[in-house]
């Protein structure tokens, strides 16, 4: 121990070891405590099938046929022709998932941004941006093809997505992936992480 110019005792300890009653003149103990005890998560949320009801919207234009069935019957090109043929309106008019607002209310106060894949047409980029502006103004939207989502993965970065392949790639890059099946299940998994 020695005395500094303020005549207060300074105790030297190993980094990361501190006691509640230690003097913390420079805020180092507080900073260490935040780093060690409170992981800071960044949430990246998918839109289609998580927040927005892509399947329901698609069925409106496909005479009630589910997207997977339509693609299987007519092929991927015809599938995207149907979606992109509706232009910006397809995306702007997308309804919320039945539990989408509950899910959003739970995550919106964390460091959260949207990470969504556009379709083959640029109209989806505009439509998704307009949907976000109309439904959750000010929220950051990143548009990236599905195979590029993994580039945003990092320790303590959480991807919430309804596609298992996106989750698997995210985890392979060191991120935390939550396969979204419902708001209730995703919220439960977030609670396990302390959120």
Stretches found by the model and what they are:
Residues 39-84, 172, 182:
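Active-site neighborhood of HAD-like aspartate-dependent phosphohydrolases
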Residues 1-43, 50, 68-69, 96-101, ...:
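Charge-dense, intrinsically disordered terminal/linker segments
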Residues 84-114, 121-126:
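Short, acidic loop-to-helix structural element flanking the phosphoryl-transfer center
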Residues 115-158, 164-168:
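Substrate-recognition "cap/lid" segment bordering the active-site pocket of phosphatases
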Residues 39, 108, 151-155:
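Flexible, charged surface loops at secondary-structure boundaries
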Residues 158-190:
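Acidic, Mg2+-coordinating phosphoryl-transfer loop and its flanking beta/alpha structural elements
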Residues 51, 55, 97-100, 124-129, ...:
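A structural signal for well-ordered alpha-helical scaffolds and beta->alpha junctions
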């Amino acid at each position: 121990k020695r005395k500094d110019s303020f005549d207060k005792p300074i105790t030297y300890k190993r980094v990361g070891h501190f006691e509640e009653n230690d003097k913390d003149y420079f805020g180092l103990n507080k900073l260490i405590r935040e780093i060690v005890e409170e992981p800071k998560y960044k949430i990246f949320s998918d839109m289609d099938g998580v927040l927005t009801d892509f399947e329901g919207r698609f069925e409106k234009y496909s005479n009630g046929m589910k997207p997977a069935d339509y693609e299987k019957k007519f092929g991927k090109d015809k599938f995207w022709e149907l979606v992109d043929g509706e232009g910006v309106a397809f995306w702007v008019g997308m309804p919320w998932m039945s539990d989408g607002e509950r899910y959003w209310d739970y995550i919106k106060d964390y460091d959260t941004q949207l990470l969504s894949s556009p379709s083959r047409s640029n109209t989806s980029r505009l439509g998704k941006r307009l949907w976000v502006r109309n439904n959750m103004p000010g929220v950051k939207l990143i548009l990236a093809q599905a195979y590029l989502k993994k580039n945003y993965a990092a320790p303590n970065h959480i991807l919430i997505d309804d596609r298992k392949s996106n989750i698997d790639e995210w985890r392979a890059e060191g991120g935390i992936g939550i396969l979204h099946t419902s708001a209730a299940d995703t919220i439960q998994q977030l609670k396990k992480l302390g959120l």
